[in-house]
Amino acid sequence: MPKIALFVGGELEWFTTDFDYFVGVDRACLRLLELGLPIDLAVGDFDSVSRSELEMIQSAAKDCMIAPAEKDDTDTELALKIIFQLYPEAEVTIFGAFGGRIDHMLSNIFLVSDPELAPFMRRICLRDKQNKITYYPEGSHKVLQEPGMTYVSFLHEGDGELTILGAKYELTSMNYFQKKIYSSNEFIDGPIQVLVPNGYVIVIQTKDRS
């Protein structure tokens, strides 16, 4: 399965380059060019770049898809849909999903609420130096600790009682309490088991800023 890096418009102070393909969204394409990385696909309405910058992007990109400014999807959502149409088995890591406009950041965090993207949630990851976000659908899952990360939080999008086992702070039917996000939990000696009754859970692994 191809590994794809998707660069979007938030903060890009940290990223990795061990990918098969690089996709840029709107102005993030310029960042790829600055870094000397290829642009296998450029996607967006490109309303945040000048005409000369767009021409530079079009010249460098192997493929460029320009979308209308008025549309139902964000540029990032559109890019993901195109990626999974081309590569249904792809694993996508998104860089630049955090920072910048809060509405953009929240749209990125809740990307898999889109019915077209929900089937691919296990293959989408949001990443920066301090945070890693992954998604788990309804069912029982083992969550592995990301090397270097200290804390783990769970945000359940759905009804019913989320169950967390094998963590420093377990959540079961015996001690269940409802919160939007169960934050600042920790791994102990191995994976954490999470049981999602319906919907999906957002798993956020983090560490303090050094």
Residues covered by each model-derived region:
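Anionic-ligand-binding alpha/beta catalytic cores of soluble enzymes and soluble regulatory domains
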Residues: 91-140
